[in-house]
């Protein structure tokens, strides 16, 4: 029986994780659930899964949850940053699902890594921001980090066992790998007239053709910044050079990514676009468990198609690839700028096409400094956020 902590329990990855747990109750126990402010959802899942601990980042939310939980449930409600870091480091915890969205997930994810936990990594921003520090912490503690993002999970499944055991330091060329092919659907605006993009609404941007996701990642998929962040994540997870990484647009979202080998072979992982599949794979690795996902029906799929990315349509993807080449400071700045600009778009303060412009401006205007600690990273993250907020204010 594995004791699990689910960071970001009220989000879409949290819901999918709890669904997989419910399919395999004899193997997994929900030890703790962690959320930010969503008391109603947290109350619902606490009653359903009865964790030992329910942690709310927001203190008022914690108080509200404590008042609403049925008295017969023996659930400890906690709040506070120190309490969260202690929770993920606890000797009672075996596995941590790291699914808090954005930079907010970095401290708790890194704490779990430092504690040597089995970390199921859904928070791509942790690697985008901390990169080398994250990999070094993983190697020092012996933590097992397994990629939950469908693309990185697909790549992981297509690699040799030796490469799987050497995440963060694998020798792709030595394993015969010539290219990692990251696939992406192209989002809801793949075929939209470029002249119409500036008028696209948050509701339109959040209507992904294949996946069910939260609003922030849905917008990132529409701009293809999500693929850019995944490019950066792949660079660190698989110790890949820019020459070894390629992005391929695949509108059907059936092939989740591919690995091309020196001998001409291409290995691909296919499946229905449902996050329960990579989650179940990570939870059980190297075994296999029931995910609750319907088997892929090839006759319904009918055909698979592939396109080269158009950087005029997807400038955010180009920005992320360039930031990756520049290094850790640039990717930290870009991630922070993007979080702010996407939220501004969702709040109706800027246009869809302003996201890329503001991100590029922040990347050029934010002064960087060497990142030698998590405090350095968070300081640069804050600096970039302030610079981006200033740019949005001037725009309006």
From Swiss-Prot:
Where, by residue number, does Mn(2+) bind? 149, 151, 230
Write out the entry's keywords from A to Z: Isoprene biosynthesis, Manganese, Metal-binding, NADP, Oxidoreductase
Cofactor (UniProt): Mg(2+); Mn(2+)
| Keyword Glycosyltransferase tagged | no
Q: What pathway is this protein said to act in by its record?
A: Isoprenoid biosynthesis; isopentenyl diphosphate biosynthesis via DXP pathway; isopentenyl diphosphate from 1-deoxy-D-xylulose 5-phosphate: step 1/6
Per the similarity annotation, which family is this? Answer: Belongs to the DXR family.
- Protein name from the UniProt record: 1-deoxy-D-xylulose 5-phosphate reductoisomerase
């Amino acid at each position: 029986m594995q004791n699990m902590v689910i960071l970001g329990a009220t989000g879409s990855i949290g819901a999918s994780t709890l669904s997989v747990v419910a399919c395999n109750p004899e193997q997994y126990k929900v030890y703790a659930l962690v959320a930010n402010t969503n008391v109603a959802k947290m109350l619902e899942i606490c009653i359903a899964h009865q964790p030992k601990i329910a942690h709310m980042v927001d203190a008022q939310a914690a108080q509200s949850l404590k008042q609403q939980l049925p008295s017969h449930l023996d659930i400890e409600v906690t709040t506070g940053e120190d309490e969260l870091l202690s929770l993920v480091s606890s000797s009672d915890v075996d596995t941590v699902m790291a699914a808090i969205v954005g930079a907010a997930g970095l401290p708790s994810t890194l704490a779990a890594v430092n504690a040597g936990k089995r970390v199921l990594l859904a928070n791509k921003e942790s690697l985008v921001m901390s990169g080398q520090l994250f990999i070094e912490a993983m190697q020092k503690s012996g933590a097992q980090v397994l990629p939950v993002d469908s693309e990185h999970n697909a790549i992981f499944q297509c690699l040799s066992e030796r490469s799987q055991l050497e995440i963060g330091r694998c020798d792709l060329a030595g394993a015969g790998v010539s290219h990692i092919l990251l696939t992406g659907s192209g989002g809801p605006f793949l075929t939209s007239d470029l002249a119409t993009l500036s008028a696209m609404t948050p509701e339109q941007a959040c209507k992904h053709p294949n996946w069910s996701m939260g609003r922030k990642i849905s917008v990132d998929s529409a701009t293809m910044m999500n693929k850019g962040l995944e490019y950066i994540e792949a660079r660190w997870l698989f110790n890949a050079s820019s020459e070894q990484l390629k992005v391929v647009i695949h509108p059907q979202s059936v092939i989740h990514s591919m690995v091309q080998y020196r001998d001409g072979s291409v290995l691909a992982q296919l499946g229905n676009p449902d996050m329960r599949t990579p989650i179940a794979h990570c939870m059980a690795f190297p075994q296999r468990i029931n995910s609750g996902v319907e088997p892929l029906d090839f006759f319904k799929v009918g055909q698979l198609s592939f396109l080269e990315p158009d950087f005029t349509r997807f400038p955010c993807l180009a920005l992320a690839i360039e930031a990756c080449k520049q290094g850790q400071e640039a990717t930290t700045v870009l991630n922070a700028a993007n979080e702010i600009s996407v939220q501004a778009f969702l709040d109706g303060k800027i246009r869809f096409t302003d996201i890329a412009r503001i991100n590029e401006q922040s990347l050029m205007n934010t002064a960087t400094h060497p990142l030698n600690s998590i405090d350095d990273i968070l300081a640069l993250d804050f600096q970039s956020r302030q610079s981006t907020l200033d740019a949005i204010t001037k725009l309006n």
